Each structure stands twice: as C-alpha cells, then as structure tokens.
C-alpha cells in the first residue's frame, strides 16, 4: 500500500475508534487551554506551537484509551455497540492490540520529551489500566467516582500546563471539574445496561435498578455537582444558564426512552462539560 494511502487508512481508523469521545477529551482540553493563554505576552506563533504540542498529547491520550478499552470489551461491544471497529470487522483484534501499543508508546514518549506533563501522563495510564484491566473498573464507584475524576484531572491539568504554568485558580477549577465528573458520569451507563449485564459489570443501573439510578443521578448527583461547581467559583459565572442546563439534563435522565435516547443524553452531558470549560476560559480572559 502506498505511503499516502497507508497514512489515510490509519487516520480513518483513528477516527473510527475515537470520534465519539472527542467531546470528552480533545475538544474540552482545547477549550480549557484557551483559558491558559490569558495574560501571556508571547508571540502568536509561540502560542500556536504550544497548542499544537498539546494536540500531540491529547491525540494519543484518547487513542490509547479507546483502543485498550475496545480491545478489552469486545463482548460488550457486540451487544451495545456492534458498529465499533472490532465487532464490525473493520479492524482485527490483533491489529487493535498493535495500535494500542503504538499509541501508548507515543503517549509516553511525548511526556518524556516534556517531563512537566509526566504526572498527568502516568495518571492517565494508571487510570486506563484501572478501568480496562481490573475488576474495580467494572464497578460504578471505581469506574466513575474514581477513574473519571482522575481522568479529568489528567486531561485538564495537562491542557493548561501545556500552555502556561498552573495557577491557584486553575487548580481550584480543575478539582471542581473532577468532583463534577465523579458525580455525573454515571449518565454514560444508562445506555449500556444490556451489554454491561452480559459481561458482569456493576454499574449504577445494575446495582440500584434503572429508575432508581435515574433518581439518584437527578436528585442527588446533579445538585451535588452544581454545589461543587459553586465551591470552585464556576457556577457563579452563569448560574441561570448552568442551572437550566442541569435541569434539562435531569429531565432527560428521568425519561426512560431507550438506549439511543440515553446515548443522546450522554452526548448532551459532554456538551455541558465543554460549555462549563468555555465559561472558565472566557472568565480567564475577562469576557464575563
């Protein structure tokens, strides 16, 4: 296969594995990085170069995770997501395994090139291993309350530090977003009950029942998450808008309209994640 065709093929495979997760990785990381550009007197070319470097970290960040996640969850994907590359036959299991090793090597190599990102890189590697290679990653508490919080820290801390040194305000907001994610990411499991049950996972809907988990998310997790945003100084940036978005999210969670509807609810949730980070970046630049 010609080199250009091979490169195009690999780009297509990268998109196939990762595009559904961009609104929870590359996009929010990029949005948060904009906030780190405030007050910098660097030339535009330097800022662009730093952002391009961040993209070289974010790309293997999500590719390494999605590859290993899908390599270790083929049985579930055959039920919940049969159109993914491995169950659909687009990529063989062995091919995905080879690519996961390559993505891991690139991801670690970027951090070794820029050691300031090594803590976040090692955190994400550990989080991915915890999720994909241990039984604790199959339990609702380990999967969401722990792993999504540590993953959010790795994503947001690296996205800021790739542009500018961290500040007390940026750290406070990162920790607030980690708490928000730990409480709310259970939303992703509402759409995958059938496959999760088949492989023995203990997600919130399987432990507390479908409607029970929806009540927990809507009336306990979402209000608590808003309180954490308030403690981090984020909710005050646009209280009416953020309150309304969380109310709409809760309304969607309570509706038992099928897995496809629940998937759209999860995507809406990731857009809220991006919006919150946009508010933070706008505030950093004095725009709100």
From Swiss-Prot:
GO MF annotation list: transferase activity, transferring alkyl or aryl (other than methyl) groups
Pfam families in the cross-refs: UbiA
Location relative to the cell: Membrane
A GO cellular-component term linked to this record: membrane
Cofactor(s) the record lists: Mg(2+)
Induction of the gene: Expression is induced under erinacine P-producing conditions.
Keyword Membrane assigned: yes
Keywords: Membrane, Transferase, Transmembrane, Transmembrane helix
InterPro entries: Prenyltransferase_related, UbiA_prenyltransferase, UbiA_sf
Residues annotated as transmembrane: 24-44, 51-71, 101-121, 145-165, 215-235, 268-288
Membrane topology recorded in Swiss-Prot or TrEMBL: Multi-pass membrane protein
Record's keyword annotation contains Chaperone: no
EC number in record: 2.5.1.-
Family membership noted in the UniProt record: Belongs to the UbiA prenyltransferase family.
Job description of the protein: Polyprenyl transferase; part of the gene cluster that mediates the biosynthesis of erinacines, cyathane-xylosides that show unique biological activities, including leishmanicidal activity, stimulating activity for nerve growth-factor synthesis, and agonistic activity toward the kappa opioid receptor. The role of eriF within the pathway has still to be determined. The first step of the erinacines biosynthesis pathway is catalyzed by the geranylgeranyl diphosphate (GGPP) synthase eriE via conversion of farnesyl pyrophosphate and isopentyl pyrophosphate into geranylgeranyl pyrophosphate (GGPP).
Protein name (Swiss-Prot/TrEMBL): Polyprenyl transferase eriF
Organism name: Hericium erinaceus
Gene name for this UniProt entry: eriF
């Amino acid at each position: 296969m010609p080199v250009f065709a091979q490169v195009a093929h690999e780009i297509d495979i990268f998109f196939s594995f990762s595009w559904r997760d961009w609104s929870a990785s590359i996009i929010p990381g990029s949005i948060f990085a904009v906030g780190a550009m405030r007050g910098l007197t660097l030339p535009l070319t330097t800022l662009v170069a730093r952002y391009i470097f961040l993209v070289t970290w974010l790309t293997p960040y999500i590719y390494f995770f999605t590859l290993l996640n899908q390599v270790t969850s083929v049985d579930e994907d055959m039920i919940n997501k049969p159109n993914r590359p491995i169950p659909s036959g687009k990529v063989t299991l062995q091919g995905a395994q080879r690519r996961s090793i390559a993505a891991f090597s690139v991801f670690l190599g970027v951090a070794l090139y820029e050691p300031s990102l090594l803590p976040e890189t090692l955190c994400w590697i550990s989080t991915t291993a915890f999720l994909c290679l241990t039984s604790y990653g199959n339990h609702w508490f380990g999967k969401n309350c722990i792993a999504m919080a540590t993953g959010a820290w790795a994503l947001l801390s690296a996205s800021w530090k790739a542009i500018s040194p961290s500040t007390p305000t940026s750290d406070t907001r990162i920790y607030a977003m980690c708490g928000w994610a730990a409480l709310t990411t259970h939303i992703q499991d509402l759409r995958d009950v059938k496959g999760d049950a088949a492989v023995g996972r203990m997600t919130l809907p399987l432990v507390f029942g479908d409607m029970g988990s929806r009540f927990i998310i809507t009336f306990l997790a979402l209000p608590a998450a808003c309180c954490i945003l308030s403690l981090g100084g984020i909710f005050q940036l646009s209280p009416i808008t953020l309150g309304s978005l969380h109310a709409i999210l809760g309304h969607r969670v309570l509706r038992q309209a099928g897995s496809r509807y629940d998937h759209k609810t999860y995507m809406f949730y990731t857009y809220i994640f991006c919006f919150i980070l946009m508010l933070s970046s706008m505030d950093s630049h004095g725009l709100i």
